[in-house]
Regions:
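Charged, alpha-helix-enriched surfaces in structured cytosolic catalytic cores
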Residues: 161, 291, 333
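Conserved small/polar residues in nucleotide/adenosyl-binding loops
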Residues: 336-344
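Short, well-ordered amphipathic alpha-helical segments that serve as non-catalytic structural scaffolds
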Residues: 254-255, 295, 299
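Extended amphipathic alpha-helical segments enriched in small hydrophobics
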Residues: 285-293, 297
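Short polar catalytic/cofactor-binding loops
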Residues: 280, 344-345
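Catalytic alpha/beta active-site cores
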Residues: 1-279, 284-285, 303-306, 310-319
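Flexible, glycine/threonine-enriched loop-and-boundary segments that flank and lead into catalytic domains
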Residues: 297, 321-333
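RNase H-like, Mg2+-dependent phosphodiesterase core
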Residues: 348
């Protein structure tokens, strides 16, 4: 069918179904057409908009075969009570087949308070492990060779301090910093707008983050120096579009600050990683991740002049959306064919 006939047929179709469509409107806050035809992709540039898997603009993934060729790191978010108790849990998880560690810190640790501080009362070891000293960090990873495991630490305000402790524990094990692999969340801007576990004002907090960028790029090249928190913003009430927009704005602020401090984008940007939400909207979530990969690649290349492929990639860790789960329907939360299973499926499909 040529273009004119297709347009004529589309016009006739829309007129015919207008009354039925009016009874079932689309979401007002989300711009999307009900029907797409070849007319919508007349100017579609395959290389620019889609490309090949593992190549710029990474729409189809940052690896050529994605999860069929390389499974994602599997790590349960874990931490509770004392360092010794959490250490036992980590060893159990690793023996059970987990391929990385994800450290949950308690709220006093997240805001830089010792466990015996009066404001810590009732919160010590409650939503994560309590880390007050280097001795606690040594106990947390006792018997776990840090050159053999990738460790993600969900910590923001005192992230630089916890990273320094981790490096010290590794050195005590005889492991050099350049052999370490892992991530610190280290995203303070989303704490101001979505969570609240900040310690210092924005400017000194940003300096700590950019200093961490520089240190890691020179000494711990395999370390992800930040995990930009789109997830927390979404869980605080943002839409799929806002999730990307606000997280990208925060990430660009970090990049601008690092460049202003004299760092080169190709040196520190490969250490930028992300944490996104996987929600229940199948097509919306798949489109979100694919669009975000392409948009971020263009921002890094065109705005910041990044030439190293890893500096252009949107490397993502995903959490399924806790906001869609309900205590009243707990059996619907976890099963493979229901909420969490469906959210995981959406991520695998993008």
């Amino acid at each position: 069918m040529d273009k004119e006939k297709l347009q004529q047929g589309l016009n006739e179709y829309e007129a015919k179904v207008a009354k039925a469509v009016a009874k079932f409107p689309e979401r007002k806050n989300f711009e999307a057409q009900r029907l797409y035809t070849p007319l919508d992709i007349e100017d579609f540039d395959y290389g620019e908009k889609l490309g090949f898997p593992g190549q710029y603009p990474f729409t189809r993934g940052v690896q050529p075969t994605m999860y069929r060729g390389r499974l994602w790191t599997m790590r349960a978010y874990a931490g509770f009570a004392t360092a010794e108790e959490t250490n036992a849990r980590y060893k159990y998880l690793l023996e059970a087949g987990q391929t990385g560690l994800s450290v949950a810190m308690d709220l006093p640790t997240q805001i830089g308070l010792d466990s015996d501080h009066e404001l810590s009362h009732g919160e010590v070891g409650k939503v994560g492990v309590a880390i007050d000293s280097l001795a606690d960090m040594e106990a947390l990873f006792d018997g776990i060779p840090l050159d053999k495991v990738s460790t993600s630490m969900t910590i923001n305000g005192p992230a630089a301090v916890l990273l320094a402790m981790y490096v010290a524990v590794a050195e005590k094990q005889g492991v050099k910093p350049d052999a370490l692999k892992g991530t610190i969340q280290n995203d303070i801007l989303k704490e101001y707008i979505a969570r609240g576990t900040y310690i210092f004002p924005p400017r000194p907090s940003m300096r700590l983050i950019t200093d961490t960028f520089e240190y890691c790029s020179k000494n711990i090249p395999k370390w992800n120096t930040i995990s930009v928190g789109a997830y927390h913003i979404r869980e605080a009430g943002a839409s799929e579009v806002q999730e990307i927009a606000f997280a990208f704005a925060n990430a660009m602020a970090y990049i601008d600050a690092a460049i202003k401090a004299g760092q080169k984008v190709d040196d520190f940007a490969p250490g930028i990683s992300w944490i996104f939400t996987a929600g229940l909207d199948f097509f919306g979530e798949v489109a979100k991740f694919r669009a975000a990969r392409r948009l971020w690649a263009r921002i890094m290349k065109e705005r910041y002049g990044a030439s190293v492929p890893k500096a252009q990639m949107l490397r993502v860790h995903v959490h399924t959306a806790g906001s869609v789960l309900t205590a009243q329907q707990h059996l619907n939360n976890r099963s493979e064919e229901r909420r969490v299973g469906k959210e995981c499926w959406r991520v695998c499909m993008c």
